[in-house]
Amino acid sequence: MQKKSVALVACSNGYGHIKRLLLLAESLFMAGANPTLFADRSSAELIAKKEQILIPKVINFDTHTNKENWLDSSAAEWVKFAPNLSKFDIVVSDNLVEILLIRPDAWLSGSFFWHDALNFFPHDLKKNSISLLKKYNPKMISSELFTSNQLKTYTKLYEVGLFGRTNFIKKSNNKTDALIACGVGGSVKKEAFEFTKNLANLKEIKYRKVWVEPDIIPLDRPDWMIPATFLPEMYQKILVAIIRPGVGTVTNSLSVGAKIFPFYESDNLEMQFNAKKIFLAGLASKTHSINDAWKASELFFESFDKDNFHEEKIAKINFNGAEEAALIMLNHI
């Protein structure tokens, strides 16, 4: 029987969308399909190598759909120069609603819509997005932990687990390290850099090592502060993750049993939503600034060996979202 062909089209705002589609592509391949990823090739190759994900065929295609593109109304223009997707059995986009203009039968993946996640989103663009969703009522895959209510309103929703990696899922009783990271970061990156500069002046800390995202690590730093690699070997040493709560970094941190201490920019609705969801699930502290996140993490460090509640919450998480999504999609042809 001929393999089903699947086109995967990524939003270009950060690495999370590409990573999710890489994991989905790997699962689709393992399930007998033939996936092709449409994304920035260099980003896809970097993520696949770092996260040890099997890389599919990649067509170098940048949708130019970052935050600034959405706010100036140019993001929806990507459909005008999109490649021909008519020959694919299945088309998936994470998380571009405009894919429905090209393939009305397309799947969406993600946990939110851009028109709900950004402040000052252009009114006409939001109106067009909602109109597309109402017209086509697309099928959508979302990790249950992060599903927003809007997805339930406008799509045929299939909820799955987190898109985890089996090579990350390894517990250890000898965790002594902390991670500080902010991803693309937005306006919070400057705050994070100032914090790490001040942190580097401390003579003693509670952790053995503090892994810091390279973009925000000071040049003049002590031996205990080292650049974060985001490789499995790093994550397996992490007890606490002081992070801007993007779904990808949250997933990797949780998969090794780390507790999340979030910080994020006050005007980012997506980060607010993610932080609230993981707090309500008992997986994170209720913090907003990086200073508060650090202080809360130190209190956790002093008592984590007695914190059976956190271990119990971690044990209940489903990390098989990519495999579940692949089977759902292939069974709906």
Language-model segments: what does each one mean?
Residues I18-L28, E45:
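Short amphipathic alpha-helix
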Residues E298-D305, A315-I333:
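C-terminal alpha-helical cap of glycosyltransferases
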Residues H123-M140:
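Membrane-proximal helix-turn-helix segments that form the acceptor-binding/catalytic region
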